[in-house]
Amino acid sequence: MLIALLIILAYLIGSIPSGLIVGKLAKGIDIREHGSGNLGATNAFRTLGVKAGSVVIAGDILKGTLATALPFLMHVDIHPLLAGVFAVLGHVFPIFAKFKGGKAVATSGGVLLFYAPLLFITMVAVFFIFLYLTKFVSLSSMLTGIYTVIYSFFVHDTYLLIVVTLLTIFVIYRHRANIKRIINKTEPKVKWL
């Protein structure tokens, strides 16, 4: 019973639409009607600006971190990464936003922040290196996911390897429109690097 409650709670935490809430509070807009139409942090940065976008990314990361901590907070015998996966599913398919959410990047990062802080720190550094080199947030996100799989292979944590592999595949799948735009040379590049 407690495991089911924890899974539902993790999903509901992930379902909190940070981008929608911050968009309404900061600018009075629904970010799903602007930019890429996505509820994630990248669209929040593009449509709301750096300050509000930073709040969105922090909120999305926090969702993954909090959900991954639930097994410890609730004293439930379930692997924390499983709770984190349900938060990611909530973020991508949020019940509070008609099941149309983000692309799983920041919330997946939040899962790793709690479970594997060193991986999270190196992942953020790797993301910014890829962003500097490519100027594409989407491509940097996908390449960083691949980095997490390689890293996880060497730390000999089977659960971590399985979860980051599945999350990376999911992140790449969620970016399929971005991949087409990169190939067609229509994907927006970051201008501040």
Curated annotation (Swiss-Prot):
A GO CC term attached to the entry: plasma membrane
Pathway recorded for this protein: Lipid metabolism; phospholipid metabolism
Regulation: Inhibited by acyl-CoA.
Family according to the record: Belongs to the PlsY family.
UniProt cross-references to InterPro entries, sorted A to Z: G3P_acylTferase_PlsY
Membrane topology: Multi-pass membrane protein
Gene name of the record: plsY
HAMAP family: PlsY (MF_01043)
NCBIfam families: glycerol-3-phosphate 1-O-acyltransferase PlsY (TIGR00023)
Listed name of the protein: Glycerol-3-phosphate acyltransferase
Subunit structure: Probably interacts with PlsX.
Residue ranges of the TM segments: 2-22, 54-74, 76-96, 111-131, 153-173
Localization per record: Cell membrane
EC number(s) given by UniProt: 2.3.1.275
Catalytic reaction equation(s): an acyl phosphate + sn-glycerol 3-phosphate = a 1-acyl-sn-glycero-3-phosphate + phosphate
Keywords: Cell membrane, Lipid biosynthesis, Lipid metabolism, Membrane, Phospholipid biosynthesis, Phospholipid metabolism, Transferase, Transmembrane, Transmembrane helix
MF terms (GO), sorted A to Z: acyl-phosphate glycerol-3-phosphate acyltransferase activity
GO annotation (BP), single: phospholipid biosynthetic process
Biological function: Catalyzes the transfer of an acyl group from acyl-phosphate (acyl-PO(4)) to glycerol-3-phosphate (G3P) to form lysophosphatidic acid (LPA). This enzyme utilizes acyl-phosphate as fatty acyl donor, but not acyl-CoA or acyl-ACP.
Principal cellular location given in the protein's record: membrane
